[in-house]
Amino acid sequence: MSQVQSGILPEHCRAAIWIEANVKGDVNALREASKIFVDKVATFQAKFPDAKLGAVVAFGNTVWRQLSGGEGAEELKDFPVYGKGLAPSTQYDVLIHILSARHEVNFSVAQAAMAAFGDAIEVKEEIHGFRWVEERDLSGFVDGTENPAGEETRREVAVIKDGVDAGGSYVFVQRWEHNLKQLNRMSVPDQEMMIGRTKEANEEIDGDERPVTSHLSRVDLKEDGKGLKIVRQSLPYGTASGTNGLYFCAYCARLYNTEQQLLSMFGDTDGKRDAMLRFTKPVTGGYYFAPSLERIQAL
């Protein structure tokens, strides 16, 4: 069995760092840097076993085609604009995702990543996420209630089983900026109908009682009776005095599942948009492929 990268399956991490970057010059330097980075991660995992450290290095479409010789990751593509511009594309070449129970360990690993990749990349965005009270989003609603639980279930959803891509996963990242003042002008019942869950108790509102534009209705999708699931590794980010929101991060064995949710949220299926756009907006968007550890070492 191919070994999946260690940042894909963990649950309930306390903190994370995401780094998106473009390649500078020859991709051969990226090959070697990626190998060095995964070795560094293993060293930190051995040094800080209590941190439950995980990490991922993933690649955008153009760079992955160069690294892989065009083999595999057939669904991978550049992130397009959705909803006639409501969801912008900020596609980059490389994604580094670090998560654990200890922010200081994450930061040390991020420093090691910068040393490993060096001049091979140009960092375009770096976001530090944190687990908030009761695993809630900054909106006050519990985040990720429908997230698959347990390693076996999460592996089934997130990890490609067979073929040249075995052990790999498609990654989607999208940073959302909240307007909490706008949210707090709404009554709690209105907020609950917008999300599709009660705020305090986190109970699902029945489908025939909540609007079709509620967030839950837009993303709880089924085909042939089977849910289009993704494994989420999202966390709040930001400052109390400035910009804050949710850094959405999801892994899936099929990019299809992720894209169907996006098409539904931004009105590209039936013209109806996710009601949570009343108080929050996406400002970035990227698709990546995270190969197995064996495939990274064979680049």
Spans of features found by a protein language model:
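Long, histidine/aromatic-enriched segments associated with O2/redox biology
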Residues: M1-L299
